[in-house]
Amino acid sequence: MLKLTLALAALALAASCSQEPSAPKRNPRLPEPSALAATMQAMTADMEALKIKAQAGTLTLSDVESLRMAHESIKTDQPTKPEDIKESFPGFAEAYLANLDNLYEAIKNQGDVEAQIEAFNAVISTCESCHQQHCPGPLERIGGIKAAALVP
């Protein structure tokens, strides 16, 4: 009987270890993020991923085009709390997209790495400026996305 119990326990352990890990579960008490929050989460992840490319000077036109298309909805996405959005928000959204266009131009004009870093950081500075007025919570994380300037 003991051998049977041990065999079943070993089998159960082996079966549980071979299963694929489940996706992290959301806290059911937290509401789904608004469209604007989801876009900004994607923006953060995208810019964090491109920081290394910016520092290496290996950003491509395709990288920036993809960002521009993915983030265009920032102008129309609904916020979590519409009453917290100030009149200045649309201007910041437009400035963010314009700075992505400037980054695109810096790459297109085959600007040196320093010019690409400067244009990349201008995009991030737009995010910082907006968050100083609208939602200061992620400011530290946003500041950490800036690419380090080249040391002469």
Where do the language-model regions lie?
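C-terminal motif of bacterial Sec signal peptides marking the signal peptidase cleavage site
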Residues: 14-16
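Bacterial N-terminal signal peptides that target proteins for export
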Residues: 1-7
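Sequence context surrounding c-type heme c attachment/ligation sites in exported
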Residues: 18-152
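Active-site-proximal loop/hinge segments that shape catalytic or ion-binding/gating pockets
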Residues: 10
